[in-house]
Amino acid sequence: MVCAMQEVAAVQHQQQQQQLQLPQQQQQQQQTTQQQHATTIVLLTGNGGGNLHIVATPQQHQPMHQLHHQHQHQHQHQQQAKSQQLKQQHSALVKLLESAPIKQQQQTPKQIVYLQQQQQQPQRKRLKNEAAIVQQQQQTPATLVKTTTTSNSNSNNTQTTNSISQQQQQHQIVLQHQQPAAAATPKPCADLSAKNDSESGIDEDSPNSDEDCPNANPAGTSLEDSSYEQYQCPWKKIRYARELKQRELEQQQTTGGSNAQQQVEAKPAAIPTSNIKQLHCDSPFSAQTHKEIANLLRQQSQQQQVVATQQQQQQQQQHQHQQQRRDSSDSNCSLMSNSSNSSAGNCCTCNAGDDQQLEEMDEAHDSGCDDELCEQHHQRLDSSQLNYLCQKFDEKLDTALSNSSANTGRNTPAVTANEDADGFFRRSIQQKIQYRPCTKNQQCSILRINRNRCQYCRLKKCIAVGMSRDAVRFGRVPKREKARILAAMQQSTQNRGQQRALATELDDQPRLLAAVLRAHLETCEFTKEKVSAMRQRARDCPSYSMPTLLACPLNPAPELQSEQEFSQRFAHVIRGVIDFAGMIPGFQLLTQDDKFTLLKAGLFDALFVRLICMFDSSINSIICLNGQVMRRDAIQNGANARFLVDSTFNFAERMNSMNLTDAEIGLFCAIVLITPDRPGLRNLELIEKMYSRLKGCLQYIVAQNRPDQPEFLAKLLETMPDLRTLSTLHTEKLVVFRTEHKELLRQQMWSMEDGNNSDGQQNKSPSGSWADAMDVEAAKSPLGSVSSTESADLDYGSPSSSQPQGVSLPSPPQQQPSALASSAPLLAATLSGGCPLRNRANSGSSGDSGAAEMDIVGSHAHLTQNGLTITPIVRHQQQQQQQQQIGILNNAHSRNLNGGHAMCQQQQQHPQLHHHLTAGAARYRKLDSPTDSGIESGNEKNECKAVSSGGSSSCSSPRSSVDDALDCSDAAANHNQVVQHPQLSVVSVSPVRSPQPSTSSHLKRQIVEDMPVLKRVLQAPPLYDTNSLMDEAYKPHKKFRALRHREFETAEADASSSTSGSNSLSAGSPRQSPVPNSVATPPPSAASAAAGNPAQSQLHMHLTRSSPKASMASSHSVLAKSLMAEPRMTPEQMKRSDIIQNYLKRENSTAASSTTNGVGNRSPSSSSTPPPSAVQNQQRWGSSSVITTTCQQRQQSVSPHSNGSSSSSSSSSSSSSSSSSTSSNCSSSSASSCQYFQSPHSTSNGTSAPASSSSGSNSATPLLELQVDIADSAQPLNLSKKSPTPPPSKLHALVAAANAVQRYPTLSADVTVTASNGGPPSAAASPAPSSSPPASVGSPNPGLSAAVHKVMLEA
């Protein structure tokens, strides 16, 4: 439009200049030409220019020969030019018809227009007349000039031709001879024809003419308005057929009457001056004067004013109509119908002139082109679409603004462009305004211009477009809260953008692959190229690490220094793994918790995968980060974790055999790090997506590198579980390593100070304490198996406390407990549970002072299952000899544990026996089996290893030559003990690794004396123990405090019982003096009834557990022991047990007094040894009772003298409340003839002393007998919760239920209850079943007045 208006203005300026030149041209034409009357038809090619072809037709009163003479020379001169122009015209038309249609966008404003004045019938006739005249004169007539058409309607063409013909009929324009003006116009004509061959026109020598009062178009028509409708579609090839049709329509228009002519006269000003600038005629009219020309100009100006007023009225009507259409409810429908019916646009950029022009275009087009692809059809379609879009924009403006505010979630003026819409909704919600219901069925069209007409529908539309009631704030928002809300919204927006970007990046596999590979190469220093050079250099000239450690393995200072350097070197590598994880796409979007969880769980895995190429299986070594080589044997000797090292090397060899590339290693590291199955992750969805994409990238790389190995990816992923297992083992090892070495320097300084004090004080220094006074129980203190709560009850008394109290033995001078605690406070605190230090590994006891009196039994003994060790065992030879001469049965569980337990421990030294490794002659190594996680006790790295370990098994760690010598010497010493004391029946089993058959004890002392550093190491205090820490954690709990209280009571009760048994045994008859062989070598479970004082009973009970294959893992903590214990008693059973104990305690004194009456009065069968079957039954059913009593072999005959019920007292936690009526001399022996049964509520075993079951005999049916003396018969007892309490007259005693011990499924046991009314102690004889009558029946007391009630119980 702008270009069109500029062109129109330029044309108007040219026309004004031509109007000024018009009077001068007219005067020249009047002077130089004769007055001749002729009609001139002008064929004008107009682009504001001047290609004119004038054909003159003489009038009837003028002779033909004059005109012929005048123009003869002219036509002859023009004949050649015309022929050439016709040829050019013909060629241009052919090219134009054959060319493609010209698009609207390619048309320029300056286009040449064909003007043909044959639309009116008179003009057609004149053209035919001229053609006939030219044929007579052998001249070719002027034909149509070819141009391209413009884009507007052809109504202006009709106006132009009509105006021309009207002016010629009235003879208003006088044109005379053409020669004077010919000089002014030929150059533009030549230039114009030269620019384009298709724009050629017929030039004339004298195109002089007068201008037909051209004026600017007041209607504002565009430049593209054409003047001939026939050529609006130049790309159609049916041009001549359409031309004939147009002629017929024009004939109908001429015969329409004078109305059509008046309309044509009323529109002379509508001539598009941009296309036609001048109209030329060559025949002057003498009748026309300047006055007539002035009148013509006056008429044209009046007509222009009339047209302008009409256009203004139409514009006003259209605007009103547009306003009405917008206000209507169905505006869209009206817009569509209006656009289709009328082309008068409702566009914001259109004016009234354009609207009128569009109407005229439609009127002219209806009579013209019938093609759908015509220019006019395009214009009408475009205008209708433009109007529709304009209306849609106005209608949807508020909706778009509302949607934009709804997307941000806040209704603020900063978000929306219109503050009123926001304020209306906010006021409506805050003030709770109730608007009047809509009267138009609630279907009002809410637009920007009419939104205030119906507030009800306006509020309804606000809610419909997404405005939220919750987003409206009632009151002022604080600045802090507002800033927080804005920050949260901004963060949410950024997160959404990052997530979209991440999704795009993850979906783009090449991009993800490139990012991961770039991250791996930038953060990993150990690529295949670099590592290959390092491995080659290590093979050619290796530089081994840790030479100082190998030279002096007991000196920890160089190792600590190297470890610090090692940690510093690894810090950079670990940092590289962290940076690599951060560069993985999507990792930065995770929360801090998820990042920490993934890195903590997968850091070692990824690091190990990166460094897997540093393992060289060809030289059986590993290349350190500094380029040095560390041999596999050195790692084993230093860390003493062979299983972990072997597993690591095997896994490395397995991974290196796959020959992974750098790309595969990088992607595999990413998969190891980004694993969705880590516990504690929150954003699982994102992590799973990342994992799947990374796995797809790895699959793509593997398929590309190894097309012939389709199962390679599955094989690679199968290594992840093994990798995690190694990571777990390594982490456990690091935890222990970190815990130990925090106190390493302080502990060594402490040991050095104690070692200096040990030179002058042999019996008072810490070394003297470890060498002399530290017996098995005190020094050994297996913290891994004995909890700190039990250690609190230990007593640092002399070893004589473990001896029988009835025998006085000369003992060497011992240190007092107070002196021990004062000289070794750390050890005392350790044993009492106050300081959770762990015992050092391989730290045996050495004694340079008093070496002749000491015997080093073993340097250390391992507790197999949990990786803990026992500290050195130092034992006095005199004490050992005294105990062996006396033949005490419980010497295996006293403080000198190593002396009498040689056979059992040597059997346990065998690899197939994994039991308590506490032997006097053998030292047991730790099992390096898959159960070993690689966690050692703490100082395994300082062990002096053997140079050649050819005789070691593949499942054990290599030991030093010192250990081998000690093992062999211990075996030899044990063999000597067996020879000297054959009654112990010690079965000697040679160690597994014994290069020498026997070694003297002097060699052991010499080895220790020659190695003072080893002596100090072995005398060093224990290190921290994680098991003790766990025990300390459980200690404050009230549940375990209660258990400790019960255990203490149980220990006291059992100790008193075992003490009385020892006294009676020592003062027994000569029959009992020889020790039976069947009791001399009991298994550890059967020999667990040794007597002890109350102070040591708890530790004693724990070390002598009844289970034959008790795993030390079960004694890892109090909780583990409680879980491994036997079933607990129900509250009802506990109540019954308490009642029984109360009644038993009442008769303890009377039972003790009654035992002194029958000394030596025993039946012959009572002193016999029970048969092996009975012993087997005893061992079989020893721990099967779960109620209140343990099984015992019932005596087949009871003498009348054995009526006293001297039962061994037991606490509520002890289930061994069995009290058989025995003789005075063997009451305790018969009572303890069965195994001790552990309480469900205690973590230690009882201490019933195993004695000779001489009171038992061959009994076909073992019965369970319980005798209870009730002092007061007026107190009834209710033993069952379900059964009612029997009346006191019928029930005067307690009936206790027990599990029968017999092989048969059912057993009837006789329980004899005797009630006593304060008289002498009553005795009840329990008869055997009817099938087996007793051999001798004891006669009851004649003074017995209570009835005997027998209760048969089905088991």
From Swiss-Prot:
This is Ecdysone-induced protein 75B, isoform A. Induction: The expression of this protein is developmentally regulated and is correlated with the 20-OH-ecdysone induced activity of puff 75B. One of its GO terms (biological process) is regulation of ecdysteroid metabolic process. Residues 218-228, 254-264, 1149-1162, 1174-1196 have a biased composition (Polar residues). InterPro entries: NHR-like_dom_sf (IPR035500), Nucl_hrmn_rcpt_lig-bd (IPR000536), Nuclear_hormone_rcpt_NR1 (IPR050234), Nuclear_hrmn_rcpt (IPR001723), ThyrH_rcpt (IPR001728), Znf_hrmn_rcpt (IPR001628), Znf_NHR/GATA (IPR013088). It is found in: Nucleus. Pfam families: Hormone_recep (PF00104), zf-C4 (PF00105). Residues 66-76 have a biased composition (Basic residues). Belongs to the nuclear hormone receptor family. NR1 subfamily. A zinc finger (NR C4-type) spans 387-421, 438-457. Residues 508-756 form the NR LBD domain. GO terms for molecular function: DNA binding; heme binding; nuclear receptor activity; RNA polymerase II cis-regulatory region sequence-specific DNA binding; zinc ion binding. It comes from the Eukaryota. Residues 384-474 bind DNA. Residues 77-91, 143-179, 308-321, 330-344, 797-809, 948-960, 987-1001, 1053-1098, 1106-1117, 1197-1233, 1242-1260, 1315-1343 have a biased composition (Low complexity). It comes from Drosophila melanogaster (Fruit fly). Its main location: nucleus. Residues 200-213 have a biased composition (Acidic residues). SMART domains: HOLI, ZnF_C4. One of its GO terms (cellular component) is nucleus.
